[in-house]
Amino acid sequence: MKNPPVCCVITRLPEAESLKKSEGAAFYELRLDLLGESWREAAAMLDKPFMATCRRSAEGGSFSGSEEERIGLLEKAAAAGAFMLDIEYSTPHLGEVLKRLRTQSKCLVSHHNFADTPSAGDLKTLVKDMLNYPADIYKVITTATSINDNIKLLNLIKEIPDKKIVAFAMGNLGILSRILCPLAGSPFTYASLNDSNQSASGQMTLAQMIEIYRSVNYENHT
């Protein structure tokens, strides 16, 4: 049965047995900031494409080096085979950074709000501002404080159909948007490899996500 593309997040060196259970993933995300020096070893274990992400502490990650070091690490990941690089919208000199990195890999520009979910109008304005920076995919992640926040993010995807936008909310109240965003038009959604690889609040495991899609017969709704 066809499932929506799911990006499987890896935050620590995986066990071979865990990877065997991840056949439902479309590709992986390697969190370079959390994997540390073991990211190369993790990349060598993968049998599917991977995206590379290196989050600063201000963006919910653990990288504490300079911006040049961080961008350099992403370049190393691209050289090691990363097909896409996640670049935060808050990155200093974003235009120059994207121009530099897009010669080496596809790029995803991301924005994370760890406090709440802005109004629908503010979300649309945010995305329009992000679109000023050429990228392959745009990602807007907020924090749900109400079940209605899921609706805002799902509508955001549908309102800009000519661009590839991933949008959902973190937190237990945002789980619904994590599951449904592909139905609204997101190119993919995220899940953790297992419970020990969770990288954000409300993130489900790959096995849980796949089971839900199978239970609701996802293929017949696309």
Curated annotation (Swiss-Prot):
GO terms for molecular function: 3-dehydroquinate dehydratase activity. 3-dehydroquinate binds at E29, L30, R31, R55, R178, S199, Q203. It comes from the Bacteria. Pathway: Metabolic intermediate biosynthesis; chorismate biosynthesis; chorismate from D-erythrose 4-phosphate and phosphoenolpyruvate: step 3/7. The active site is at H112, K139. SUPFAM superfamilies: Aldolase. It catalyses: 3-dehydroquinate = 3-dehydroshikimate + H2O. GO terms for biological process: 3,4-dihydroxybenzoate biosynthetic process; amino acid biosynthetic process; aromatic amino acid family biosynthetic process; chorismate biosynthetic process. InterPro entries: Aldolase_TIM, DHquinase_I, Type-I_3-dehydroquinase. The keyword ATP-binding does not apply. Signal peptide: none annotated. Pfam families: DHquinase_I. Keywords: Amino-acid biosynthesis, Aromatic amino acid biosynthesis, Lyase, Schiff base. The keyword Amino-acid biosynthesis applies. Homodimer. HAMAP family: AroD. PANTHER family: 3-DEHYDROQUINATE DEHYDRATASE. Involved in the third step of the chorismate pathway, which leads to the biosynthesis of aromatic amino acids. Catalyzes the cis-dehydration of 3-dehydroquinate (DHQ) and introduces the first double bond of the aromatic ring to yield 3-dehydroshikimate. This is 3-dehydroquinate dehydratase. It comes from Dehalococcoides mccartyi (strain ATCC BAA-2266 / KCTC 15142 / 195).
